[in-house]
């Protein structure tokens, strides 16, 4: 085995270990697993956003930034802003956006501290406990008419304007559309 092959193998092993640790730490620190939105579901979420091309689009808990990258690819005029609390996942999102040459802002921050007052559209895939906290935050910060699309989990005190089921595997993923 050549020295280059050994170095490459070492890097691959380190990346696999880092990714595994990221999943464990994400679960232990944030009390939620890192679960990326399937691309089929992401495409439906972007469709439900009814983007015109000039909006400020946020993804709170953006993970690898796939929703923002997809939205930006389909609507280049939008301003895409994401927040991700876990540093290694944030780095993954930054790298993905860089590799795909997708100009977007990705903040390493908690969804509850992100300023969403100028948002036109917000994407969410967060746990039920966070949905309750975000509902209060949105009531205080969002301007009228903001569209919020949530993957899997509804807001506890708000009725969606639309519910959509997306076939996934042997079942369905539910999407909830809200207007503030």
Which sequence ranges carry the predicted segments?
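S-adenosyl-L-methionine
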Residues: 1-52
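Conserved class I S-adenosyl-L-methionine
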Residues: 53-63
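Conserved SAM-binding loop of SAM-dependent methyltransferases across substrates and taxa
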Residues: 66-76
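Conserved SAM-binding motif I beta-strand of class I
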Residues: 79-84
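Conserved SAM-binding loop
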Residues: 93
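Conserved SAM-binding strand-loop segment of SAM-dependent methyltransferases
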Residues: 100-111
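A short SAM/SAH-binding and catalytic strip from SAM-dependent methyltransferases
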Residues: 119-133
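C-terminal substrate-binding/active-site "lid" region of AdoMet-derived donor-dependent transferases
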Residues: 130-180
């Amino acid at each position: 085995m050549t020295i280059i092959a050994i170095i490459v193998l070492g890097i691959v092993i380190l990346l696999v270990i880092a990714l595994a640790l990221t999943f464990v730490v994400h679960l232990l620190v944030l009390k939620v697993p890192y679960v990326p939105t399937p691309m089929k579901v992401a495409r439906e979420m972007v469709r439900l956003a009814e983007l015109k091309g000039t909006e400020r689009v946020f993804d709170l808990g953006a993970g690898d930034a796939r929703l923002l990258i997809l939205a930006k690819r389909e609507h280049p005029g939008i301003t895409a802003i994401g927040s991700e609390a876990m540093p290694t996942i944030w780095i993954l999102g930054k790298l993905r956006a860089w590799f795909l040459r997708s100009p977007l802002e990705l903040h390493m921050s908690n969804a509850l501290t992100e300023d969403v007052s100028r948002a036109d559209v917000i994407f969410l895939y967060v746990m039920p406990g966070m949905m309750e906290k975000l509902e209060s935050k949105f009531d205080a910060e969002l301007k009228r008419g903001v569209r919020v699309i949530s993957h899997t989990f509804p807001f506890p005190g708000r009725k969606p304007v639309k519910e959509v089921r997306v076939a996934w595997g042997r079942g369905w993923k539910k999407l909830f559309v809200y207007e503030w």
